[in-house]
Amino acid sequence: MRLLATLAAATAALAALTLPAHADPGPLGEAGGTLALPLKDAVKVLPAAQETRVGYTRTSFKHWTDADNDGCNTRKEVLLAEAFIAPEQGARCALSGGEWYSPYDDVYVDAAGGLDVDHMVPLAEAWDSGAGAWSAQEREAYANDLGDDRALIAVTARSNRSKADQDPATWLPPAESYRCQYLSDWVAVKMRWQLTVDDAERQALTDRVAGCPNEPVRVTFAR
């Protein structure tokens, strides 16, 4: 599936990079630039800030758009990309049949209606972590990010709604075998969009990746 392919591609050799000594490393790079770090170092360089949800509504992020005007919105594009048995595609991108795997809870799903497409870093969490200061266009780009396979993932509605807007300090996927992958993907999305972490989130990430393979996290900055 898309996420596994992306992580496999990230095992290429990394250039040496000296980590900053101060607590808040600041911006990680320019839009279009790249950065690759071992997972545990990637956690260290995420910018630090306290969270704020003042002014947030879900409509602050225009999502499920059809950027390429092919009749399939972002949700449908993810479902088509992640199906391991392709669904039939009808008028207006109506999907029937097909089969998917939900890694959050280790469940196979044979109907698109049983799936949610989850933002790896939820919209509310993104707002808390800096997106509240972005332009409407940047928030729309974030909510429909098909440029990185880790940003959006098809999972069971039940597991997605259990997660809601929580970060890894309070929620991890029920499937323990997927947790290290989940943490790596979470960090990658935060890096890609240069989203901040608060103290509790960084501590939780640090503690939880301690038992994970220290594999590289490679991103292209979206902003």
Task: Describe each model-derived feature in a short phrase.
Residues V45-L46, A91-D106:
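Short, motif-level signal for alpha-helix interfacial/capping segments enriched in acidic residues
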Residues V54-S96:
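N-terminal carbohydrate-binding/catalytic regions of secreted carbohydrate-active enzymes
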Residues M1-D24:
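Secretory targeting and sorting signals
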Residues A13, F84-E88, D106:
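Short helix-loop boundary/capping segments at the starts of domains
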Residues W100-R223:
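Domain-level detector of nuclease and nuclease-like folds
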Residues A21-N69, E201-Q203, A210-R223:
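N-terminal module-boundary/linker segments of secreted carbohydrate-active enzymes
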Residues T52, D68, T74-R75, G113, ...:
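Glycine-rich, flexible loop/turn motifs
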Residues T11, E77, E125-S129:
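Active-site-proximal flexible loops/turns
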